[in-house]
Regions:
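Conserved glycine-rich cofactor-binding loop
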Residues: 14-15
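Rossmann-fold cofactor-recognition segment
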Residues: 49-64
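Conserved NAD(P)H cofactor-binding loop of Rossmann-fold oxidoreductase domains
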Residues: 85-91
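Short alpha-helical oligomerization interface
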Residues: 92-105
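Active-site helix of classical SDR
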Residues: 115, 162
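Residue(s) in the substrate-gating loop at a strand-loop-helix junction
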Residues: 146
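C-terminal helical subdomain
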Residues: 188, 200-238
Length: 256
């Protein structure tokens, strides 16, 4: 492990986009620490990928999640990028309240718990670096939100709403970092509908491959993009549906 290697922590790394991003970062020379709830999958990834050097079981809904993140950062020997991919959601046309609340707990409370822990760690390091002669590239936070946060989706109320919350929260943290003159950049990743467990069995259109999405994500992170919609078809779609008036949108059948 050398100082030339950049270090990334990936939460939600046991499946889907998070797993593919962790693998790709390792292939591109990053030293990667991974986190998630399923220890067996974490260990399997660590043993099969040279660049994935440590892992930690973290449930983002647990109050001890921030302390576990700090433990993982210590095991990795630092952190340059925090990548947040932990999230849940359901199609919920019958409005099962338990599903709605679980989604808020993970995508809302869990998201804030982890992103704030990473931001505060970076803020402390950024302040320390101001007092030294050594320069450091911008610390980075990158999070998977969704195009589902750009318009209300009646088939997935809590998921769509929490993704909207996440995007706004990241915008707030971006502004706060600049207000406090912190060396932190933030990337809001907004994929379209990706073929993962999250939308298994759904009829959402234009479903994307997780490996292809991961490649676009890593490029966006390494270029320091502030917002990245994946892919170009969804960027066009989001632009077009932003033009639809609310009274028209709420009468449309978006997915069932």
């Amino acid at each position: 492990m050398t100082q030339s290697h950049r270090k990334a922590i990936v939460t939600g790394a046991t499946s889907g986009i998070g797993k593919e991003v962790a693998k790709l970062l390792a292939e591109r020379g990053w030293l990667v620490g991974i986190a998630g709830r399923r220890v067996d999958r974490l260990e399997a990834m660590r043993q099969s990928h040279e660049g994935i050097v440590c892992c930690q079981q973290i449930d983002v809904t647990s109050p001890d999640a921030p302390s576990r993140l700090l433990t993982l950062i210590g095991q990795l020997g630092g952190m340059d990028l925090y990548f947040h991919s932990s999230g849940i959601g359901w199609q919920n046309n019958l409005l099962d309240v338990e599903k709605e609340l679980k989604t808020v707990e993970t995508n809302g409370l869990g998201f804030v718990r982890m992103v704030d822990a990473a931001f505060n760690w970076f803020a402390e390091k950024s302040s320390e670096n101001k007092d030294s002669t050594a320069s450091h590239p911008s610390y980075q936070i990158a999070c998977i939100t969704s195009i589902a946060g750009t318009k209300g989706l009646g088939a997935a109320p809590s998921y769509s709403s929490t993704k909207r919350f996440q995007s706004h929260y990241l915008e707030c943290l971006t502004q706060q970092a600049r207000m406090r003159h912190l060396n932190i950049s933030i990337t809001d990743i907004r994929p379209g509908f990706v073929k993962t467990d999250l939308i298994a069995g759904s009829n959402y259109p234009l479903q994307l491959d997780a490996k292809d999405v991961a490649k676009s994500i890593v490029r966006a992170v390494e270029k320091g993009k502030s917002v990245k919609v994946i892919d170009w078809r969804y960027a066009l779609l989001v632009f077009l549906w932003s033009l639809i008036p609310r009274w028209v949108w709420t009468r449309m059948m978006i997915a069932k």
